[in-house]
Amino acid sequence: CKPDMDLMFVSGVNHMFFHGTPYSPKEAKWPGWKFYASIDMSPTNNIWQDAPAFFEYITRCQSFLQMGKPDNDFLVYLPVYDMWQEQPGRLLLFSIHDMAKRAPKFIETVHTISNCGYDMDYISDNFVKSTRCVNGKLLTKGGTSYKAIIIPAVKLMPSEILGHLLKLAQAGATIIFTENYPQDVPGYGKLEARRKGFAQLQKQLPEIASFNETVATPYQKGIIITGNNYQSALEKSGVVPEEMKTRYGLQCIRRSHADGHHYFISS
């Protein structure tokens, strides 16, 4: 249980529930009534005698992880339109167990960023539109700040999102495009009109010879970084990676508070 719990803690979960524990009457034969989809936190589980110590560990950890605010380095744009386009067939159902098949490129991107020593949160279109730049940092609607936003090899992007990213850069934010600029709009509704507007926005992006070289281009008050190499591009942002991740192979999550920062660290 503890390794799984630690994985959830470093992933940002800070409030644990043992949900779905089934009722079992006293007269039920051992091991009692069970349900496959719930946790078996009951006297018939051999962890039961150690449960108080385990609960104390959870309480202490999540108490600290509920203090302060999240302090992850980057926002990563979720390329949902690319994911939808790349799926075979037309019926897409929610599936928590097939994400490696549904989003292999995005998963690889997330692991690459993490292995470079950084933490991130994902962001969708609606939250991008409500994000603003304050003192060079990205401030989301929920009040959490980030040092830059990463656009990971996105091919399809709505015009309003690309336009808002450019406005954020103009206001002082750092925008990182990896592998390529967005190339087209998603969907077919009013396609020609939307493509025309999208093309006008594309012309406002910095002209670069190739994504093979990492380039940081000043863009009014902000910076637009382009390149294929994540480590080089992220270094250009000026964000310092966590050495405990890059050098020692540890996993951690960082939170900020009035007096500084605190960490949860797992080996």
What residue ranges belong to the model's regions?
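Carbohydrate-binding surfaces of carbohydrate-active enzymes
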Residues: 1-267
